Amino acid sequence: MKALSCLLAVIATAGSLFQHVDARSHARDRLNNISRVERPVIHTPSHRVHAHSHFDLTFDLYPRSSRIKLQLEPNHDVLSHDARVAFLDGEGNVDRMERIERRDHRVFKGWAWVQRKSGSWERVGWARVMMQRDGEDPLFEGVFTVMHDHHQIIPKTKYVHKRHPHDPPLDATPGEYMLLFRGSDIRTQTHDTVERSITSSPSCDADTLAYGTQSDFMFPPLPQENNTNLWGSLMTSIGRRQNSDTVGTVPGSQNLRDTIGNTDGCPNTRRVALIGVVADCTYTSTFASEMDAKTDIISVVNAASVVYEHTFNISLTLGEVNILPKNCPATASSATPFNQMCGERVGDESFTLADRLNTFSAWRGKKSDDFAFWTLMTDCTTENQVGLAWAAQLCVKGVQGDSNTRNASSQAVSGANVVSKTDNTWQVFAHEAGHIFGAVHDCDSALCQDPSNPDNSRCCPSTATTCDAGGKFMMNPTSGSQITAFSPCSVGQICSRMAKHSILTNCLTTNRGVDTISGQQCGNGIVEDGEDCDCGGDESCKGNKCCDPKTCKYTSGSQCDDANEECCRDCKFASSSTICRLSSGPCDPEEKCTGNSGDCPRDTHSKNGETCGTNLQCASGQCTSRDLQCQMHLGSQVAGSRTVAFDSYGCQVACKDPYRPDVRYEGSLTFLDGTPCGGGGTCENGQCTGSTFGNEVSDWVSRHKPIVIGVAVGVGCLLLLAILSCICGRSKKRRPRNRKMAPINMRPMPPVYNGWTGPPPNAESPGGHPQYNHVPPPINAPPPAYPGRMPSTRYA
């Protein structure tokens, strides 16, 4: 039984490692149109700008004859105060480490305006820009929106490098200049095929990777016989950007409609997510220098962060950048196994984007930082995949699984993703980060019509009654037009995950006490030493009566800032009876303001394992059980309210219908952290931790009572028979024999076995002794001396 217990423990542990889903992004489709950026003007006296400049930037779009104005200010959030760049050698060792100086990077944010025929200007969207060259002939890149249609500005060299085979050709104009394309210029997608070639638009294919028998982390669970394996993997990508390009724990599909547009759970005040980025050799090789690669990464994060700031009140901020040399090694170093040439052969197979994620995740798992996640930037693709991510791994440190094998059922899972370089890299970056935050794909016509997608459970629907989201949002499976924001369904999904603590948020810091690269910079949205408040500059501070945007001090009579402090009401501290964080149940008590501070006290939960109801225990702030989580996540596909957990051992959600006890239903979900699991342990990020061998044996016994009882009864019966046999044997030994004893002075005649003289007699004749032929002893034999009575002898 010890061996069996060990085997079951190994199986269950292995099964708990691979309940994650990864998602992939695919390259965009061809462009129908492309424009030249003409007559760019920096509106400063000398047409010069520095890292802390506030200015307007205007230009024309040819041949559309539109005049655009970008009203810009520094984006100090994009780099942390101690942001650093590590330049690695070919073996993956740090060659040198440098601090990223904020003054060296002219990174801006702001708003986009369009000039009307009347000459007036109308604000039409947001803008993010990285200035490469100022003066009278400026060069810049970035993205801005016009009525939710994103406009991408890229240098000619980048367009040429990533030009789609069917994109419009360029003229012979020499030198570097700027081009622009809109999301609406990308060819409209059809959904008559699932697999797309490199000429297809970028998509996310996490759904195409095996996760048990599923093809997407949100696919409905398939019934499995009890003897099937307990693990698998599901990976997805962004071009049909993501049928699936995420890997991780994902909430039950039946809840997506219930939370559409619900922002409960998302932060009410600004939070900062520090991230790390690595550029592999293929990515670095596309730039003239390693410094240019670093600059491009900053530009990508600058653009991607805006959708998180506007939607979730979370800034994506660079904490560390690692740059690998542009010359790819002949053989990847063990320190950086992900750093390989595109299409490199590993055995009989190519090194795919999934392999890069797997090996990069193992690398990230060894990092000891508190970053929200790490991203690997590469120039490689697998078919038309341009991105891949583990789902719902925000703030997760360490690694689960094994990266030493390329078997899809054995993977390394951590807070990591992979993004390929495209001409809209920022969008791929934002999409893959969405999966890290736990978002699934928006529904498109293909997913809505897929017979394996009952009740549209694999994706985020447009509304509670409409499936197809129309390809308008950030988590659309393919790149397309007007993709600049998250859908209401994605917003509700991510916020509800935060509210239910099904993703970690402990790495998201407030905007107070976050050192920025700019030091004491009023207007960067971060409250630093010496500042009372910082509402983010003149534009962001409009209507704020508590904070002076010029001095970052409270206005006269103000004690706090309503915009950034949860216990502030009309610029005064809220009373101690004010609830600043509502209770979500018996395991998550409400928090109240202190009355002498603008900050809400730390969110606290009841201890995991604490009883909160009949057969219910606290786990991650929720009053729940394994059965209840099964009903919540898989009930609609199994047996509704009578759905129960398949067993009490692992941390992957596996359920059953009590009337079909031998059929196992499982998906890509994991039980909440703190949920009890085998051996007296608790689930933590999909793994059963804290179990002991003794408890595992006890747990195994309790889970197999019929077998144990049967074996115990059988063994007990055998023992009873053995005892009875012994008792009977001893009783016969003590039974008196009706046998004549030899006289005390006479030597008994020893028997001599000469064989049977006739038919073999019975061993004992009735009322007498066995009959033998005897030979008399020698006549002169001296008699032996007997010490006493001879014991009886039994012959058989």
From Swiss-Prot:
Q: Where is this region: Disordered?
A: 737-796
Per the record, where are the segments of Pro residues compositional bias? 775-786
What does the cofactor field's note say?
Binds 1 zinc ion per subunit.
Top-level taxon = Eukaryota
How is it placed in the membrane, per its record?
Single-pass type I membrane protein
Q: What class of enzyme is it?
A: hydrolase
UniProt entry tagged with the keyword ATP-binding: no
Residue ranges occupied by any Peptidase M12B domain in the UniProt entry: 271-510
Q: Which residues bind Zn(2+)?
A: H431, H435, H441
- Gene Ontology annotations for the cellular component aspect, listed alphabetically: membrane
Its transmembrane ranges are 707-727
Biological-process GO terms, alphabetical: proteolysis
State the Pfam families in the record. Answer: Disintegrin, Reprolysin_5
What EC number(s) is this enzyme filed under? 3.4.24.-
Principal place where this protein is found?
Answer: membrane
Which stretches are Cytoplasmic in the membrane topology? Answer: 728-796
Query: Which CDD domains does the protein's record reference?
Result: ZnMc_ADAM_fungal
Q: Which residues form the signal peptide?
A: 1-23
Q: Does the keyword Transmembrane apply?
A: yes
**Which molecular function terms from Gene Ontology are attached?**
metal ion binding; metalloendopeptidase activity
List each copy of the Disintegrin domain by range: 519-608
Could you tell me what this protein does?
A: Probable zinc protease.
* Record's protein name: Disintegrin and metalloproteinase domain-containing protein B
Name its species.
Arthroderma otae (strain ATCC MYA-4605 / CBS 113480) (Microsporum canis)
- List the taxonomic lineage: Eukaryota, Fungi, Dikarya, Ascomycota, Pezizomycotina
